[in-house]
């Protein structure tokens, strides 16, 4: 870890505990900062808050003390990425011209290990896991390691102390995190895709969302590389305007891109066959595109075809992202709880050749589901719907001509009904197409409950 002086003796307010708040607090203490931690939740019985208190952090919880800004001067506010900028503490800090940053800004600037960054509306976690797997296989030959960190669930601050110049950080960046960075310079940055109707409750407009994503490349220069989706022409134009890095592209079908999906192989434009598609374990065209991004990043960082082929042929999928759960009575069951928007369901549903019994539903964000009608018509034989959006999704299912439409209240009710509708040889797919917050705290919690309910089928 680099011993930088940026935060030494600085008075820093951390807003929001969480995983990243806890980790960045410990990191900042080692960098010599004076810390105050504030969380609207009551932390009086929180073990992590107690640990920070013993280390000298002032902990204020249960409310937001906006008046604290009148009592003392802060040099930085480090914001939990999920906290909106309309939060009164953030608004006050911005009014006073106090820099509002997020954990990656601090952690990446003290990292001895080189790093690459990946963002996107869908597919970024799988891409990060694939890249980490390829690069770990490559770096281990010389005693190094690749670490998957960031939005994937492992705070960067947790890893930077042990990561050395022989290692690599593969960083998943959300749009929330990217809004709070001003000076990160990844050797390779990649945007897997950008879709509308994603996090607009946070970013307000699609243009704001795109601008947040583009911050991943804003500090890159001609010595760096930027990986862009050749098929999203409207976004590509904005990316090319923004970046100063050298650009490589990937495409589902366009052979003028640097990397593309061929008939039998994942290929590069110099006619090089990198990986046989049939050897890739994770299903779906979208996952083949994720593989292309991971290949592009890894090749730039020194991996060869043998590293790629080993990693991609042994990777069985990220949890909650078209995750294979089990085969039960000749039904293959998949958990795609990360499908928190229509676009994610759009790529999940066509991933299988077998007839599908689909479970969907969740938080109502005011979207219509008519774009799913053609996919329902082609791939879905029966559908079980729950949550706030169940009737909206039922309308789309009726338009698709699906005869078996079952409406229930909860996911727990949905699982056995889906099994009853299925036959040997079918796929039971949980791809909600909606956020989880009507009934669950996170998509991870929702996915864990789905897997639990599926396993309970075997005991009945």
From Swiss-Prot:
Q: Where in the cell is it found?
A: Cytoplasm
Query: What positions does the entry give for ATP binding?
Result: 120-126
**One record GO biological process:** cell wall organization
- Give the enzyme's main class according to its UniProt record, as a single word: ligase
Q: Name one Pfam family in it.
A: MurD-like_N
Pathway listed for it is: Cell wall biogenesis; peptidoglycan biosynthesis
Q: Which UniProt keywords apply?
A: ATP-binding, Cell cycle, Cell division, Cell shape, Cell wall biogenesis/degradation, Cytoplasm, Ligase, Nucleotide-binding, Peptidoglycan synthesis
**One Gene Ontology MF term:** UDP-N-acetylmuramoylalanine-D-glutamate ligase activity
Documented EC number(s)? 6.3.2.9
SUPFAM superfamilies the record matches: MurCD N-terminal domain, MurD-like peptide ligases, catalytic domain, MurD-like peptide ligases, peptide-binding domain
Give the highest taxon in the source lineage. Bacteria
Q: Which GO terms describe its cellular component?
A: cytoplasm
Reaction catalysis annotation: UDP-N-acetyl-alpha-D-muramoyl-L-alanine + D-glutamate + ATP = UDP-N-acetyl-alpha-D-muramoyl-L-alanyl-D-glutamate + ADP + phosphate + H(+)
The record ties this protein, via InterPro entries, to: Mur-like_cat_sf, Mur_ligase_C, Mur_ligase_C_dom_sf, Mur_ligase_cen, MurD
Task: Give the function comment from the record.
Answer: Cell wall formation. Catalyzes the addition of glutamate to the nucleotide precursor UDP-N-acetylmuramoyl-L-alanine (UMA).
Which PANTHER family does the record associate with it?
UDP-N-ACETYLMURAMOYLALANINE--D-GLUTAMATE LIGASE
Q: Please give the family membership noted in the entry.
A: Belongs to the MurCDEF family.
This chain belongs to the protein called UDP-N-acetylmuramoylalanine--D-glutamate ligase
Originating organism: Lactobacillus johnsonii (strain CNCM I-12250 / La1 / NCC 533)
The top of its lineage is: Bacteria, Bacillati, Bacillota, Bacilli, Lactobacillales
